[in-house]
Amino acid sequence: MGSSMPPPHVRAWYSYAFAAEVFSACALAIFLPITLEQMAREVGYYAPELTETCVINDSSSDVTGRLCKARILGVWIDTASFSMYVKSIAVACQAICIISIGPLADIAYWRKRLLLTFAYSGSLSGILFLLFPPLPYAWTPIMAAILNIVGNATYSTSIVCSNAFLPGLAKEDVDVQKAWEEATSEGLQDGLRDVHEDTDEENTGSVSREDEATHLLPDRLIPAVCAISTQDLALSDPLAKLIEPSNAKKHYESRLSLTTSRLSSTGTAIGFFSGVSVLTLLLIPVTALGGSTFSMRLAIGLSGVWWALFTVPTCIGLPGGAPGHGSDFSASQVKKAWVKIGKMVAPKQIHQLPNLYIFLLAWIFLSDGFHTTTYAAILYASSVLSMSAPKIILVGILVQLAAVVSSVLVPRVQRRLSTTSSKPVTNYKVLLAGVVAAAFIPVYTCAGLVLPFGGLRSEEEMYVLAVWFGLVFGPFLSYSRAVYAELIPPGHESTFFSLFAFTDKSASFIGPAAVGLISDLTGNIRYGFLFLLVMLVVPIPVLGRVAVERGRREAVEWAERSRKEMSDERV
């Protein structure tokens, strides 16, 4: 397939995954939560007297478990809760930015310009951590929180813009071009023109303009959302039928889909490799400096430098659109993006596709619960177990490695069990089993409230739970997309995958805020795991109500009804 080296445009696109995912895996996921907590602790005092200054990473018995509070913006806040509040605000701002920037990211003229603007703004937010004063001041936690919010928002919006290049890059592939030529030679140009041409006025795929009006994210983002293990998992389901292309048009569409999936999966793998590699290398300076706040700031700053440095090939190699139709910015474009949300959650839609929206309801809770568990566990390890920064980094590495291993092994085990069992092991069953397994983590942690032993009281337990969570988290993401893909009306994949991505981002600010508030009120972040237990257990019966077979039929009926309504309007 083509040459051994990827084309220049693809190499430039891969370079951005290599650059940005380091900031995500290192700064956003590991170092920023710890840094915010430690910066607040440096200006904090032990409750309830609020006279003795707090100590960082002191595992002595007279300090471990004591509540540290810092006065921030005139309010005394638990230092662990402060980090959770900042995370909640950051996720909310991230969701707002993703929705608002969507229409512009779908315009070729703005796509690269926005990508570079957000990339260098985000990298700068990380580099600025190197300029903080060595001594703590009352304003340093606030400034760190602002930079955290900026980093979260710019990273997410830059990924939206980056993924918007994906379909165009797939269409440049040699095999896709050959399939296009074969299709056009059979006189199928009219039917394929909207699929192949990369314009800003036309939607990709077979989605109508009416459907395009309901998109929440750029059309070019959606194939990337679908491609990461989703299509392969959906097709590997023993109950799903693989339809071979019967003509040149289907061959072209199939080749385009496979190429999109290959590029997306390769980009994801490159991003993971760079993230884990740099995270491992950063263990050296963090360990050498004793896990101090300066070592955390240094790691964040180096992540920002990496992001900026390896974005240069992206800046040079990615194509930039020339001024043209739609290149003029208008506030109405942002307004339209928000109007689209209301159309997607209209009662009529919910009534016609009940199983799809029941699944989305469960997904909102589960997605928030999983992501908050990751963040809360890091803060728990730092503030309650007093684990050093190098040890927490090791926890993060264990989670990511376990997630990759399980993402590879679980589909193979599923296929093996399906061939040896009388009843097939469907994607839905695997997802349900994964959710039940994930609920074990808050159950075990909450057991520490009533039992004198266990209940996540030691570092060894944290390492074991990190591996357990990683083994569950990887398949959870893949199989959630796979099950959802089975419930989507044929021909309307982009519309409903955008809703899936939106619900993932928009609701994930609730968990961090709730856990932070509980920790603030009780003085013990362990009580926050009671909330996480609810977030992971309550959706289980909701998810159990999803009837995938019936949902497939509803999706087909919805698509047929939509086509009929469009035909009637044309007449």
UniProtKB/Swiss-Prot annotation:
It comes from the Eukaryota. This is Autophagy-related protein 22. Belongs to the ATG22 family. The gene is ATG22. One of its GO terms (cellular component) is vacuolar membrane. It is a multi-pass membrane protein. GO terms for biological process: amino acid transmembrane export from vacuole; autophagy. It is found in: Vacuole membrane. The chain crosses the membrane at residues 16-36, 89-109, 127-147, 149-169, 269-289, 298-318, 358-378, 390-410, 430-450, 463-483, 498-518, 528-548.
